[in-house]
């Protein structure tokens, strides 16, 4: 089992050129970021730094800096991970069927770098009906 590490992120700034190999991603990301973003891992529930985060701004992809969600789309879903009801604009998030762990889910990844973000569910409480359930480790934040 993966043990979360306390290693600080190696970079929080957007990259113009993305790593072209897994070795490049390993050099760019912390061990925990690599596990979640590149190996489709999941952080433990209720441990992420953005779970109770309430500042106004933009949640970005930790892998490439792409803006994914605005803070006004974030809500408390009581699921243990940050939740959002819509992406910042169509096309920044890619959805793929995920049949692992004996469940049928929809995986969400960053459309630019392919980094694993989490999953989207159709049980959201807002008018979109969606709940983008995202690992905090997959996210960065830009203040408004």
Residues covered by each model-derived region:
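C-terminal motif of bacterial Sec signal peptides marking the signal peptidase cleavage site
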Residues: 2-4
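Bacterial signal peptide processing site
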Residues: 6-8
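A short Gly-Trp-Pro
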Residues: 17, 26-60, 66-144
């Amino acid at each position: 089992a993966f043990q979360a590490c306390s290693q600080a992120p190696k970079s929080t700034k957007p990259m113009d050129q993305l790593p072209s190999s897994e070795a490049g991603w390993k050099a760019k990301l912390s061990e925990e970021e690599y596990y979640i973003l590149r190996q489709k891992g999941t952080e433990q529930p209720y441990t992420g730094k953005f779970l109770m985060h309430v500042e106004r701004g933009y949640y970005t992809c930790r892998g490439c800096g792409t803006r994914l969600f605005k803070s006004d789309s974030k809500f408390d879903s009581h699921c243990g991970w940050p939740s959002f009801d819509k992406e910042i604009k169509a096309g920044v998030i890619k959805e793929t069927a995920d049949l692992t762990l004996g469940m049928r889910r929809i995986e969400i990844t960053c459309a630019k770098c392919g980094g694993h973000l989490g999953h989207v569910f159709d049980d959201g409480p807002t008018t979109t009906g969606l709940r983008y359930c995202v690992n905090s480790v997959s996210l960065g934040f830009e203040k408004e």
